[in-house]
């Protein structure tokens, strides 16, 4: 790796301009950028800034993230088959966040804030107050309160979505009990996971792969009367320290996976759950219910090595590595929960799955059979209608559109059918409202949503935890981008005798656990003519990409050190 540490880059804006931007009678979030020109790659930067090196930033590794995104482009299929239905995705951005200033956790209806930078005490309120309808605050009200009410200054106008600070984290599927199921009398099960956990991030390393630029973006909040020149000096020092960190990062020496045990649940039990879900459909309770199952693996795993393996073998529109103290979320999700850019709301329902073939010809044959399957088409159309209804809840009347319908997207082990639903956000709504309107995705619950969630609660033996929720961000400007947590794994590290992560699914203590617990989960949409064995096989295919990435670093840990770019998902 080529390094060019010499020279002294400058923080923009300069000291006096920064102070001028910060001047005012209200808290202000002021944007400043620092160019990073040392030839660093995203994985290397994450490793350095998350404290993996001996000279890492103190405590930064407890909360850090790596998010990588991709854009749609026209298909490059040389044969033109299914064009324009077949599309691929290519990388645009990578984001590395480190050293957050607060952590907000919502659990059992209570929001707590861990203030990591004393200057943010009092700026964040996870109590949430009352919701818009006067009811007690829910998880989204609490997250809204975790984003300080501050004027944005120094932010450029731009025509695309970009994370340059704000709230980053996950909203677990189990938040449905707070948002929906408590109202219909469904008891919340015991869970090892919070409903939500987000960091307030003010330091983001932004990689623009299309432009070849790497910048460290600061978005600190300054109070009225605060010494802005002193804060600027601190940012310069922090920028130079971070630049020095990444410039001295050695080639990655990532670990692998040493498995000690694995449990997958009973195939017969899952197929019985499918039959019971089918009975609900035939009885008219639901049109569809998404029933999931999990695999639990135990052993010692390096999350960064795992992510690198998944990134290379299963590149996807949403790649993420979230390190939250003793819980890490690693994933390669193909599906948007909701995206908000300015006043545009976007949902991308994915429904319809078939395996990849042995080559382009078989890929096209299998995709054609999927598109011609009446069951797949009916299921997809139903979920597109559900997405339209979700978006309509927060959109201006008459603005909801289906922009793309039944595109085929290719991934490492499967092909999916995707559509795009858009709407214009109503003037009195924000990103948190949009998240609430679309959460959980109908593709992870079924339809109608509330009754389908009740069926899922009755049929699945363990709480879903993070699976089926959302992972992503709400930026300072109100933009948001959250992926559905699928094709993902949670890694729970031993937390000691008092650690919450040492609690088993049945609520018993697991104080002797000294290895990581890795949970991989997948589901299938159950309708009237579902065949239990086929639905089980679909969950196996959906888990395959994540399990293969683990097995790859188990067989050969050194292979995970390859820092391959996020290439097109259809390769």
For each of these PLM feature ranges, what is it?
Residues 2-571:
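Extended alpha-helical targeting/anchoring segments
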